[in-house]
C-alpha cells in the first residue's frame, strides 16, 4: 500500500513543480473554501475522535490539542488563505553570476519533491502542512496519530476534492489512514520516494525516526522552554511575560515549563510569583529553596528531578533558584531542548551574554517564549519548529520546504 502511495506522490510532485505561483494560489483558495463548505463533516469526524480519546483517558491538554471547533476550523481555512499571500520562494535566484569561463551560473530554489510528516493529536497540522507543501510545489504523505484518524481522513478528502477540481492529482496530498504502527516503520524506509521526513510528536517518536529512518529527518517540536529571571529584572513586567508564556495556551511546544530565578531576587520575586500563579491556576513545582521561601497562595509541590526534562503541556511550572547566570545557562544546556528560552533582565550586558551562550532555535530578551511560531514570525503557517541545525532551524516556513539547484547557461561553453 505505502509503495503505491509513494509512486503516486512522486509522480504528483513532478506536476506540482511546474505550477506557477498563481496556479498554486488558486488551489489553496479552493482548499480554504472547501474546508468551510465541508465544515460539518470535518467537525462530525472530530467529535468522534474526541469522544474516543476521552474514553481512552487522554489528558485535558491532549484533548485540547485534538479538538476542533467551528472557530478553529475557520481559522485554519483563513491560515490557508494567508499562505496565498506569502511570497513563493520557488524559482527564486539565490545567487549567481558570470564566470570567467563565460558560463552564467544561477543557484535557484526548487521544491524538495515529496515530504513525509508523522504527527500526533493535532488535526490542524494536516491542513498547515498540506498548504505549505502545495505552495512550494511539494507532494506530501501524512501519517497522523490514531487519536485523530477520522478527522485527518475527513480533512484529506476535502483537500483532495479541491485538488481534483483544479485539475491536479489527488495523490499530491495523501494520508495513511491505517492506525497500524508497523506502517510507521515501513514509511521510515521509503527513501526511494520521500525526500524529507518531519516527525511532530513526543521524544519517543523523534528517537524512532532518528534511529530507523533511511530518509533525511528534521526533528523538533519538543519544547522544554525556560525563562530566566535575572537579578535586575523588573518584577511587574516579568510576571506579565511569565503568565503569557505559561497560561495563554499551555498545550503548545513554546509554552514555558521551567522558571529559573536568580538567588539575589528570589525572596522578593517568589511571593509575587506565587500570588500571580494562584490567580492563574498554575501549580508550582519548587526546588528546596522555593519550598522554604513559599507557603502559598499558589499550589506548591516538591519538584521531582525528572520533571526538569518534562513537557508538562498543562498549568504546571517548575521553579528553580540558581546562583547566577552561569547556573541558569548550565541548567538550560542540561535540560533544555534547544527550542525557545528567554531572559528577563534590565542588564543589557547579561542579555547579550544569554543570547550568545544559549544555543536554542529562538532566544528572547524580555519577551514571551510563545512567539516561536511561523505566523508570529511572519512566515505564515509552519510545517514544524525545528530544534536541530540542518537543514532548517526554528519555525519552518516556505523556504524550509525548498532546496536549490545550480543552473549553468552557456553558448558552446567548455571547461578549459
Curated annotation (Swiss-Prot):
Enzyme class: oxidoreductase
Subcellular localization: Cytoplasm
Database matches in InterPro entries: Ald_DH/histidinol_DH, Ald_DH_C, Ald_DH_N, Aldehyde_DH_dom, G-glutamylP_reductase_CS, Glu-5-SA_DH, GPR_dom
CDD domains, A to Z: ALDH_F18-19_ProA-GPR
Signal sequence extent: none
Cited function: Catalyzes the NADPH-dependent reduction of L-glutamate 5-phosphate into L-glutamate 5-semialdehyde and phosphate. The product spontaneously undergoes cyclization to form 1-pyrroline-5-carboxylate.
Protein name (database record): Gamma-glutamyl phosphate reductase
Amino acid at each position: 500500500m505505502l509503495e503505491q502511495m509513494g509512486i503516486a506522490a512522486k509522480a504528483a510532485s513532478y506536476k506540482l513543480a511546474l505550477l506557477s505561483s498563481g496556479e498554486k494560489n488558486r488551489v489553496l483558495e479552493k482548499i480554504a473554501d472547501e474546508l468551510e463548505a465541508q465544515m460539518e463533516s470535518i467537525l462530525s469526524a472530530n467529535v468522534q475522535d474526541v469522544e474516543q480519546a476521552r474514553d481512552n483517558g487522554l489528558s485535558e491538554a491532549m484533548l485540547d490539542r485534538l479538538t476542533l471547533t467551528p472557530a478553529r476550523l475557520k481559522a485554519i481555512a483563513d491560515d490557508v488563505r494567508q499562505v496565498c499571500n506569502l511570497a513563493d520562494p520557488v524559482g527564486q535566484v539565490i545567487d549567481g553570476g558570470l564566470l570567467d569561463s563565460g558560463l552564467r551560473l544561477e543557484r535557484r530554489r526548487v521544491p524538495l519533491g515529496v515530504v513525509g510528516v508523522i504527527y500526533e493529536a493535532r488535526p490542524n497540522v494536516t491542513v498547515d502542512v498540506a498548504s505549505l507543501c502545495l505552495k512550494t510545489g511539494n507532494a506530501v504523505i501524512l501519517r497522523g496519530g490514531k487519536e485523530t484518524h477520522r478527522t485527518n481522513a475527513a480533512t484529506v478528502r476535502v483537500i483532495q476534492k479541491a485538488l481534483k477540481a483544479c485539475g491536479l492529482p489527488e495523490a499530491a496530498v495523501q494520508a495513511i489512514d491505517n492506525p497500524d504502527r508497523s506502517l510507521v516503520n515501513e514509511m521510515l524506509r521509503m527513501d526511494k520516494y520521500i525526500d524529507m521526513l518531519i516527525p511532530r510528536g513526543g521524544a519517543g517518536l523523534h528517537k524512532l525516526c532518528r534511529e530507523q529512518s533511511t530518509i533525511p529527518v528534521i526533528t523538533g517540536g519538543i519544547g522544554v522552554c525556560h525563562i530566566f529571571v535575572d537579578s535586575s529584572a523588573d518584577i511587574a513586567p516579568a510576571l506579565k511575560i511569565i503568565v503569557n508564556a505559561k497560561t495563554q495556551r499551555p498545550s503548545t511546544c513554546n509554552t514555558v515549563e521551567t522558571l529559573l530565578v536568580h538567588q539575589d531576587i528570589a525572596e522578593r520575586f517568589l511571593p509575587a510569583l506565587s500570588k500571580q500563579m494562584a490567580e492563574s491556576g498554575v501549580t508550582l513545582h519548587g526546588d528546596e529553596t522555593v519550598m522554604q521561601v513559599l507557603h502559598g497562595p499558589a499550589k506548591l509541590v516538591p519538584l521531582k528531578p525528572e520533571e526538569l526534562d518534562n513537557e508538562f503541556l498543562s498549568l504546571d511550572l517548575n521553579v528553580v533558584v540558581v546562583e547566577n547566570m552561569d547556573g541558569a545557562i548550565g541548567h538550560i544546556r542540561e535540560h533544555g531542548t534547544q527550542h525557545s528560552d528567554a531572559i528577563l533582565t534590565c542588564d543589557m550586558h547579561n542579555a547579550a551574554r544569554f543570547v550568545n551562550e544559549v544555543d536554542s532555535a529562538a532566544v528572547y530578551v524580555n519577551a514571551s517564549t510563545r512567539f516561536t511560531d511561523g505566523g508570529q514570525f511572519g512566515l505564515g503557517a509552519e510545517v514544524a519548529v525545528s530544534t536541530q541545525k540542518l537543514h532548517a532551524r526554528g519555525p519552518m516556513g516556505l523556504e524550509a520546504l525548498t532546496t536549490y539547484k545550480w543552473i549553468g547557461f552557456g553558448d558552446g561553453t567548455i571547461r578549459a
